[in-house]
Each structure stands twice: as structure tokens, then as C-alpha cells.
């Protein structure tokens, strides 16, 4: 947290709490696995956003040959990220259909969908922005604590949301010194996964709030402070960070 502190002229810091959000698609998660008894080929119809990932998981966990299973995502309504992960019901309907040699259908009701669909956005973010007397950004330091729920989610892992928050905290600004510590904390809640921007809304809210606070601190127009620190077109591609 001392990164860039020797150059510090002033420090703007705050603590931000982001509330948990739940995707709620009009169509609940639904799966049908059909079987061709003559060829022993399975076809899974899933309201998923990631049919390729679902097929890979079926091959991995059920030991089914790649030419034996086809995953089809028909035209469905919005998923908003909540249908972009593997759910155990997808594996279960395929396993039962393969075992019993009969079609299997599973449709979640609204209550089940609300309780078991992956969620997002529950973080506490401690951040401080250091800038000089002219308003030039010197460094950004942060701690990101993410409530990731009871278990990880395939294939993104439970760290997806908190890591994305940390990765986007700098926004479009020239900040040469950046440090972020991320801690993922388990709880008795549903797992977190991709949903509506995956870390970007929280990151943007934090950095832009700090910039507004800094503008008030140095009595500068917030738009001018942003223009003074924004990455210019002639500075692209811009990458000054060392990732560890």
C-alpha cells in the first residue's frame, strides 16, 4: 500500500461496498437430453450461453466420446451471464439419459432459478488515489474483498469477479504505479460468476468516485482533471504495468 507514497502530495481514499446482484432471465434454466437409440448419440438442448464449454465439461466429467454428444443452444431470451457457466443439472440430465436410454427433461421453476443461478457484484473495495499538487495521478492502491459464495463455478472459478474488479480499477487513466490485493471469501451463498460486465461496474464506480473526490479536494473541474490524466490516442497501445 506504500506504492508511490514517496511522491505523494495528497491521498484520496474511501471504502466502497457493492451489493450482491442476481440475474433473473424471463426464461428459467431448462435442459432436455434426447437419445438416438440406434446410434447411441445424445443431444442436449440447453438454455446456455456457452454450448461449447458445456460439451467440454460433459466429455471431461462423464467420459462420453466427443462424437457421441451434441450440445445445442436454441434461440432463447437474455441470460446476462447467469447462463454462461456449467450447472450440475446439465450433467445430470445427460448422465440419466445415457444410463436409462431415454430422453430426460429438467426445467427449473422461478424459485429454484433465483436460488441457484450464479450471482455477482458482492465486494468491499478499499482504494486510495495519490496525486500531486497539479492533479497528476501518481498511484492507485486497493484491497478487493469478494464474497464468492459456497463453491467455485466452472469454468471461470470463484475468483472471476474480484479479479476483474482489480483489473479494471485504473479505468482509462495514466496511473504508472498500481497495486491491488484480492481476497476471495467463501460463504453460504450461491456461487458468483459472470454477470453484466463482470467487475467493470464496480471498478468504474470506484475510480470515478475517487476522481470526483480528488477534483473537489484540489478545487479543479472534474472534467478537466479527467482530461489531464486520460490516456491519449497517440499513447496507444498503453501498457506500463508489471503483472505479478
Model-derived regions, located:
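Short coil/turn connectors at secondary-structure junctions
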Residues: 28, 38-42, 64-68, 100-104, ...
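Soluble metallo-hydrolase cores and metallopeptidase-like ectodomains found primarily
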Residues: 13-30, 39
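Beta-strand segments within the central parallel beta-sheet cores of soluble alpha/beta enzyme folds
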Residues: 68-74, 101-111, 138-143, 175, ...
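Alpha-helical support elements that line or immediately flank enzyme active sites
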Residues: 31-100, 196-224
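Single conserved hydrophobic/aromatic residue that forms the stacking wall/gate
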Residues: 1-8, 12, 243
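Gly/Pro-rich active-site capping loops and adjacent beta-alpha segments
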Residues: 50-54, 59, 112-201
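Glycine-rich and small/hydrophobic secondary-structure elements
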Residues: 25, 82-133, 192-217, 238-242
Amino acid at each position: 500500500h506504500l506504492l508511490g507514497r514517496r511522491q505523494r502530495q495528497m491521498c484520496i481514499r474511501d471504502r466502497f461496498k457493492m451489493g450482491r446482484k442476481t440475474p433473473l432471465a424471463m426464461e428459467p434454466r431448462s435442459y432436455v437430453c434426447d437419445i438416438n437409440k440406434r446410434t447411441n448419440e445424445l443431444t442436449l438442448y440447453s438454455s446456455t450461453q456457452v454450448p461449447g464449454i458445456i460439451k467440454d465439461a460433459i466429455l471431461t466429467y462423464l467420459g462420453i466420446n466427443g462424437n457421441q454428444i451434441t450440445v445445442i443452444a436454441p434461440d432463447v431470451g437474455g441470460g446476462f451471464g447467469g447462463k454462461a457457466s456449467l450447472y450440475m443439472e446439465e450433467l445430470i440430465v445427460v448422465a440419466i439419459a445415457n444410463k436409462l436410454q431415454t430422453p430426460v427433461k429438467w426445467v427449473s421453476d422461478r424459485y429454484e432459478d433465483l436460488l441457484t443461478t450464479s450471482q455477482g457484484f458482492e465486494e468491499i473495495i478499499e482504494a486510495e488515489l495519490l496525486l500531486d499538487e497539479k492533479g497528476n495521478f501518481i498511484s492507485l492502491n486497493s484491497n478487493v474483498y469478494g464474497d464468492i459464495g459456497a463453491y467455485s463455478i466452472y469454468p471461470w472459478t470463484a475468483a472471476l469477479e474480484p479479479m476483474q474488479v482489480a483489473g479494471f480499477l485504473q479505468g482509462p487513466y495514466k496511473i504508472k504505479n498500481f497495486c491491488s490485493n484480492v481476497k476471495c471469501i467463501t460463504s453460504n451463498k450461491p456461487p458468483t460468476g459472470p454477470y453484466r460486465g463482470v467487475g467493470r461496474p464496480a471498478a468504474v464506480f470506484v475510480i470515478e468516485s475517487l476522481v470526483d473526490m480528488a477534483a473537489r479536494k484540489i478545487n479543479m473541474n472534474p472534467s478537466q482533471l479527467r482530461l489531464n490524466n486520460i490516456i491519449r490516442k497517440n499513447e496507444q497501445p498503453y501498457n506500463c504495468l508489471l503483472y505479478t
